[in-house]
Amino acid sequence: MSRCRVGAAGMLEGADCAVVVIGDEQKSDVWIEDCTIVMSNMHTMAASLGLGSCWIQGRSREAAEGGTTEDFLRTILKFPENFRLEAILSLGMPAVKPAAYELETLPTDKVHREFFGG
């Protein structure tokens, strides 16, 4: 599975677990949003359990050997054509725990107040 994505899925090779999140585009026109909510919730829950996790974007991405990440995973997992790939959540025990950021060291040029550019 680590070859499912160009340059971004190497950690899957040694991951303890990977959750592939797919949505049925025939049942929902907001399957992308639904899958994104699922990914966000699992990401947050993993952190609360002390697990390391990494969101690997799958939709509209290329596999290492060519073709799409979605088709690569469809071949392995055999999910039907109407199910579409959103992402993969890699899970495992973190090798290191980085220190928390200090608020005053964070860049603020992306923070806007009241209106864009404000």
Question: Which ranges hold each PLM region?
Answer:
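Acidic, surface-exposed loops and disordered segments
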Residues: 1-118
